Amino acid sequence: MTTNTKEANSPAAERVASGHSSGNAVAQALLDEFNRELLTTRDFLERIPESQLNWRPHDKSMTAGQLAFHMANVPAGVTRLSLADESPAPDFNAARQEAGSVHEILDSLDQSAAYVRQTLPTIDDERMRDTVKIVKDGRALISLPRGVFLRSLLLNHWYHHRGQLGVYLRLMGVSVPSCYGPSGDEPPRTLTA
């Protein structure tokens, strides 16, 4: 695995890590990571066979198409949620949207990514420290600084589902892309800034 220590040791990264950032360093750090990870996520989504969009590993699991469509829309959805100081919790029991095709999933990903790229730079570091709450029945399910909210619910949430999709691909007999190291099917990819 190749890592970019230059970026990890950059002045902007040090300011973000120490909590002494100014301007929109937090948004830029999140956006830099998002842009790098977008390529890998797209690679995973492109591998889903059209004929397997309705496949699921278990009755309680999302179909491959539902999972992929969710992954495509997480970036814009979470970014939108982060703009308000308080939002109602989504209905976790609502039916998941089905994807009609891999092309539809990739188009949704492109639109979602465009929204993130347009919106994140408008959130300055002061706003990144403000609290975002997700509330259900008068109780805060989530109460985090906006930057932490975005890190957790946009990026970490995305990686969680990408890992799920990797298992789906393996069980479908599809070659799994490398991510941070070899996948069993591919050597590690090179990570760069």
Question: Can you say where each PLM-predicted feature lies in the sequence?
Answer:
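Solvent-exposed, charged/polar functional surfaces in cytosolic regulatory/catalytic domains
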Residues: 40-43, 47, 111, 115-122, ...
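Acidic catalytic patch
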Residues: 122-138
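Short, contiguous alpha-helical
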Residues: 2-7, 12, 31-45, 52-95, ...
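Short, charged, low-complexity loops and linkers
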Residues: 18-32
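Helix-adjacent hinge/juxtasegments
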Residues: 80-124
